[in-house]
C-alpha cells in the first residue's frame, strides 16, 4: 500500500511540473506584460487563457484525486499502526482462557505506580529504540521517493554535449540553461525555433537586474566536467553557428539541494548507528539484563544490577507449607525464620537473635526450592530470589556489583528474605587456580561474605540458599554468623512418599480415594524424590488419557513407574526368536534365584518387553529401605544378580552379552564389600572409598594391596556364581516353565509366579514394603500391633553405610 501511494504521488507531481515549467507559466507571464503588446498577441493570449483554464481544471481534479488517494492510504489501519509508536492493543484471548478472578483495581494501580517508579530510566531507552525502529523504515521509503526527483522526473532525458549542440542548439530550440551545483546542465527548450517566435520581454526588478527566466520546458540534461570548460565549449559552438553575442543562450548558475544525495551522505552514519543500537538491544538478553530482546528493558549501563524475582503478600499462585510434604523436620526448621519475622518480640524478650542464614542441602528433586517458595508464601514479608549463576557475567566487576545491589534492595525492604538458588556457582572454596574467571568468582564470593557478616550489615535480612553440593562450598561461607544452620533435606521415606503422593493425587481423577493409592505407590517407589513422584503422577494421567480412560487406575500408575524406571516401552523393536528366548530364560533365572534366597528382595513382576535404549527386559522388585546391610544380605543380592547368566549357561548352553549390566553391579558391590566395608579377612579392617569429585588419579594403597583386593573380589564372585548355578540346577524345570510363560504373555506378575513356584520358603517377621503394597498402611499397622515383632537393634551413633562404589584397580 505504501509503494502504491508513492507511485501515485510521483505521477501527480510529474504532471504538475509540466504545467509549472511549460506553456502555462509562459502564458501567465504574457498576461503580465505591458498593455502595448496585448493587441499584437491577442490570439496567443486567448489561447493562453484557455490553456490556463484547462490546466487549472485538470489540476483541481488531480488534486482531488491525490487527496482521495492520501486519505485512502492513511486511513489504512495497518499503515497507521506501522507509523505509530504506541503499543498494539491486546487481542481478546480472555474469551478462550477466562481468568478466575479479577484483580482489585487498587492493587493494580499500586503495582503500576511501583513499576513505573522502578523502570523510569529503563523506559527512556525503550522509548528511544521504539521511535528509532518506527522511523527507520519510513526514512528508507522517503529516500527511495526522493531518489526519483534527484535529477527531475522521469520525463527528463540525459543527452551528451554533442547531441545538445546538433539537435537543440543548432535548430534554436534552447531557451536557456540552468547549471545546477556546477555539475549538471539543465536544458530548457522551446516548442518552436527562436526565429518563428514572437519577442519575449523579460522584466527586471527595477534595479537593472533582469529577473530569472521562466520560459521553456525542462526536458534534457547533461553532466559537465567543469564550468570553465562548459562555457568555453558553449561559446565556441554558438560562435560556429554565427549567433550574435547579444543573443547567446542565457546560462544561469543555481545551487540546489538534492535530498537523495544529502540522505545518502548521512546513510552510512545512520546505518552504523542503527546497527549499534539494534545490536545492543539484542545483547540485553545475553548480558543477563533481561529476557530475549531485552524483555526487562534494562540497558547495558544497568548491567551491574541483579535480576531479582520479587514476591510479597500480593503475589499470585502462592505456595504454602501445607503444600510441602515429606520433609517435616526441615519444614519445622525453616518455619522458625517465618515466625521470627512475623513476631520478633517473642524471641527478643528471651534474648534470642534470629539466625542470619540457613543453607538448604539435599539431593536434586527433594524440594529445596519448593520449600523456599513456601517460605515466601507464608512469611508475608518481601522475598527476593536469585540464582547463583546470575551473579557471574562476562564483564569484570559485575558479580560484586550485583551482590551489593541485591542486599541494598533487601535492606530497603527490611524485614525481608533473600533466597540464592544453586549457591555453589559462586560459593566454591577459594584457592584453587588463579585464572581470570576464578578471580571474578572469588571477588563475588568475598563481596557476599562481607554483605552477610561485615561492618555494613544490618538486621532484618535473612539469607536462605540451596545447593546439592555442600562439600565444595567455602568454609567461610558455612561458619556461624553467615549460614548459622544447615538444613538437610533427604529423599523421603515411605511415610514421606505417602504424604507427597496424597498432595499430587488430589489433582488427578481416580477410581479410589487418594489414600488407597498413596499407600501402595509409596511402597513401590523406594528412593524416589518429590520430583520423581510428581513425574509418576503426571505420566499416569497421560497414559490414562492415551488409552481413553475415564479415571486413572492402578495399572496406569504401574505403567508410569515402569516408564520412569526402565524408559519408554518399545514393542515394535525387531528381535529374533533366539534373542527373545535368551532374554526370557535370563529374566526367569533372576526370578527363580531371588525367590529361593532368604535375603533377596520380593519380586513384583518380570517382563521381556524392551524398554529404553538397551534393556531387553527386566525384573522389578519391592525393596525394603534398610539403613544397614549385612554380609549375608549382600551375598544373596550378588547371587540374585548373577541368576540370569547362570540360567543362560545351564538351560541354553550358551552365554550372551545380556548380563553386562548385571556383572557391572556385581563388581561394584563386591569391591565395596572388600575395599570399603572391611568384610574381607585378607584385606583387614581397612576402607578405601573412592573420591566423589572423580579426581582419583592415585590409589591410596600399594600395588600389593591392590592385587590382594582383586584376588579377593574374584574369589567372592566365583563363590556366589557357584551357589547360583546350584540353585538353577535344582529348580531347572521351574525356570523353563516361567521362561515359556514369559514368551507367551511377555509380562508376569507375582500371582503368576505363585502358581508355578508356590509360596516363598522365607517369611519376614517384620512388615515389608511388599506387604504395604498389597494391603496398605492401615491394615498392616493393625496386624503389626496385634502380632509382636522383634525390634531390630540399631546403633544410633553409627553412620549409614556408603553407597556401594567401584574402586578402580
UniProtKB/Swiss-Prot annotation:
Transmembrane annotation, as ranges: 132-152
Report the function annotation for this chain.
Answer: Probable ATP-dependent zinc metallopeptidase. Involved in the assembly and/or stability of the complexes I and V of the mitochondrial oxidative phosphorylation system.
Identification of the protein by name:
ATP-dependent zinc metalloprotease FTSH 3, mitochondrial
| Residues at which Zn(2+) binds | 586, 590, 662
> Which family does the record claim for this protein?
In the N-terminal section; belongs to the AAA ATPase family.
Q: List the InterPro entries.
A: AAA+_ATPase, AAA_lid_3, ATP-dep_Zn_Metalloprotease, ATPase_AAA_core, ATPase_AAA_CS, FtsH, P-loop_NTPase, Pept_M41_FtsH_extracell
Topology with respect to the bilayer: Single-pass membrane protein
Please share the entry's free-text remark on the cofactor.
Binds 1 zinc ion per subunit.
Entry keyword Plastid: no
Where in the cell?
Mitochondrion inner membrane
Cite the residue span of the transit peptide.
Answer: 1-83
Which residue stretches belong to region Disordered?
93-122, 776-809
Active site: which residues? 587
Composition-biased stretches, type Basic and acidic residues, lie in 93-121
Chief location: mitochondrion
GO BP terms: proteolysis
Q: Which PANTHER family match?
A: ATP-DEPENDENT PROTEASE (PTHR43655), ATP-DEPENDENT ZINC METALLOPROTEASE FTSH 3, MITOCHONDRIAL (PTHR43655:SF35)
- Statement: the UniProt record of this protein carries the keyword Cytoplasm: no
Q: Where does ATP bind?
A: 362-369
Per UniProt, the keywords (alphabetical) are: ATP-binding, Hydrolase, Membrane, Metal-binding, Metalloprotease, Mitochondrion, Mitochondrion inner membrane, Nucleotide-binding, Protease, Transit peptide, Transmembrane, Transmembrane helix, Zinc
Amino acid at each position: 500500500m505504501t509503494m502504491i501511494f508513492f507511485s501515485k504521488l510521483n505521477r501527480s507531481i510529474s504532471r504538475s511540473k509540466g504545467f509549472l515549467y511549460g506553456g502555462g507559466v509562459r502564458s501567465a507571464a504574457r498576461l503580465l506584460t505591458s498593455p502595448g503588446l496585448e493587441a499584437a498577441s491577442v490570439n496567443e493570449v486567448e489561447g493562453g487563457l484557455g490553456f490556463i483554464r484547462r490546466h487549472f481544471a485538470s489540476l483541481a481534479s488531480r488534486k482531488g484525486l491525490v487527496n482521495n488517494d492520501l486519505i485512502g492510504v492513511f486511513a489504512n489501519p495497518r499503515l497507521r499502526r506501522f507509523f505509530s509508536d504506541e503499543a498494539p492493543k491486546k487481542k481478546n484471548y480472555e474469551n478462550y482462557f477466562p481468568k478466575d478472578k479479577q484483580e482489585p483495581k487498587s492493587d493494580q494501580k499500586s503495582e503500576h505506580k511501583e513499576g513505573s517508579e522502578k523502570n523510569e530510566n529503563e523506559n527512556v531507552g525503550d522509548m528511544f529504540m521504539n521511535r528509532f525502529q518506527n522511523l527507520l523504515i519510513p526514512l528508507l521509503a522517503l529516500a527511495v521517493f526522493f531518489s526519483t526527483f534527484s535529477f527531475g522526473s522521469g520525463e527528463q532525458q540525459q543527452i551528451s554535449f554533442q547531441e545538445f549542440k546538433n539537435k537543440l542548439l543548432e535548430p534554436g530550440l534552447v531557451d536557456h540553461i540552468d547549471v545546477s551545483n556546477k555539475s549538471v546542465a539543465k536544458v530548457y527548450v522551446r516548442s518552436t525555433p527562436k526565429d518563428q517566435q514572437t519577442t519575449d520581454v523579460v522584466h527586471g526588478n527595477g534595479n537593472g537586474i533582469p529577473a530569472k527566466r521562466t520560459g521553456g520546458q525542462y526536458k534534457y540534461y547533461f553532466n559537465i566536467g567543469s564550468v570553465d570548460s562548459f562555457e568555453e565549449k558553449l561559446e565556441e559552438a554558438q560562435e560556429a553557428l554565427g549567433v550574435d553575442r547579444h543573443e547567446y543562450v542565457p546560462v544561469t548558475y543555481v545551487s540546489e539541494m538534492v535530498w537523495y544525495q544529502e540522505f545518502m551522505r548521512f546513510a552510512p552514519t545512520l546505518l552504523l548507528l542503527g546497527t549499534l543500537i539494534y545490536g545492543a538491544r539484542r545483547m540485553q538478553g545475553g548480558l543477563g539484563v533481561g529476557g530475549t530482546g531485552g524483555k526487562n528493558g534494562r540497558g547495558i549501563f544497568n548491567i551491574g544490577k541483579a535480576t531479582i524475582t520479587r514476591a510479597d503478600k500480593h503475589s499470585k499462585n502462592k505456595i504454602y507449607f501445607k503444600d510441602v510434604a515429606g520433609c517435616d523436620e526441615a519444614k519445622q526448621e525453616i518455619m522458625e525464620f517465618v515466625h521470627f519475622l512475623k513476631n520478633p518480640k517473642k524471641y527478643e524478650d528471651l534474648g534470642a537473635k534470629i539466625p542470619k542464614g540457613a543453607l538448604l542441602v539435599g539431593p536434586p528433586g527433594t524440594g529445596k526450592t519448593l520449600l523456599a517458595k513456601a517460605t515466601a508464601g507464608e512469611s508475608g514479608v518481601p522475598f527476593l530470589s536469585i540464582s547463583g549463576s546470575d551473579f557471574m557475567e562476562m564483564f569484570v566487576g559485575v558479580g560484586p556489583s550485583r551482590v551489593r545491589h541485591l542486599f541494598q534492595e533487601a535492606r530497603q525492604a527490611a524485614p525481608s528474605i533473600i533466597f540464592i538458588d544453586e549457591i555453589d556457582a559462586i560459593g566454591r572454596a577459594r584457592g584453587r587456580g588463579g585464572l581470570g574467571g576464578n578471580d571474578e568468582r572469588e571477588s563475588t564470593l568475598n563481596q557476599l561474605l562481607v554483605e552477610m557478616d561485615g561492618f555494613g550489615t544490618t538486621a532484618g535480612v535473612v539469607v536462605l540458599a540451596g545447593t546439592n553440593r555442600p562439600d565444595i562450598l567455602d568454609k567461610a561461607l558455612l561458619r556461624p554468623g553467615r549460614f548459622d544452620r544447615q538444613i538437610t533435606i533427604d529423599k523421603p521415606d515411605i511415610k514421606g512418599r505417602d504424604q507427597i503422593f496424597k498432595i499430587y493425587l488430589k489433582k488427578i481423577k481416580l477410581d479410589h480415594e487418594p489414600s488407597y493409592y498413596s499407600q501402595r505407590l509409596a511402597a513401590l517407589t523406594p528412593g524416589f524424590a518429590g520430583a520423581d513422584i510428581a513425574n509418576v503422577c503426571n505420566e499416569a494421567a497421560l497414559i490414562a488419557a492415551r488409552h481413553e480412560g475415564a479415571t486413572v487406575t492402578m495399572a496406569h500408575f504401574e505403567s508410569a513407574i515402569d516408564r520412569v524406571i526402565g524408559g519408554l516401552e518399545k514393542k515394535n523393536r525387531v528381535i529374533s526368536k533366539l534373542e527373545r528366548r535368551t532374554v526370557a530364560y535370563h529374566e526367569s533365572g533372576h526370578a527363580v534365584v531371588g525367590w529361593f534366597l532368604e535375603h533377596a528382595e520380593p519380586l513384583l513382576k518380570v517382563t521381556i518387553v524392551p524398554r529404553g535404549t538397551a534393556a531387553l527386559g527386566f525384573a522389578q522388585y519391592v525393596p525394603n529401605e534398610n539403613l544397614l546391610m549385612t554380609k549375608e544380605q549382600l551375598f544373596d543380592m550378588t547371587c540374585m544378580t548373577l541368576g540370569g547368566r547362570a540360567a543362560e549357561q545351564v538351560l541354553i548352553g550358551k552365554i550372551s552379552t545380556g548380563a553386562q549390566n548385571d556383572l557391572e553391579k556385581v563388581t561394584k558391590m563386591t569391591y565395596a564389600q572388600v575395599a570399603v566395608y572391611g568384610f574381607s579377612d585378607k584385606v583387614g579392617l581397612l576402607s578405601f572409598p573412592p573420591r566423589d569429585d572423580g579426581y582419583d588419579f592415585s590409589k591410596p594403597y600399594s600395588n600389593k594391596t591392590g592385587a590382594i583386593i582383586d584376588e579377593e573380589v574374584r574369589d567372592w564372585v566365583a563363590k556366589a556364581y557357584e551357589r547360583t548355578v546350584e540353585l538353577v540346577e535344582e529348580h531347572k524345570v521351574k525356570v523353563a516353565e516361567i521362561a515359556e510363560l514369559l514368551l507367551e504373555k511377555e509380562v508376569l506378575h507375582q500371582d503368576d509366579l505363585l502358581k508355578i513356584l508356590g509360596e516363598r520358603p522365607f517369611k519376614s517377621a517384620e512388615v515389608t514394603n511388599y506387604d504395604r503394597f498389597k494391603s496398605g498402611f492401615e491394615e498392616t499397622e493393625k496386624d503389626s500391633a496385634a502380632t509382636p515383632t522383634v525390634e531390630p537393634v540399631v546403633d544410633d551413633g553409627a553412620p549409614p553405610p556408603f553407597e556401594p562404589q567401584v574402586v578402580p584397580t
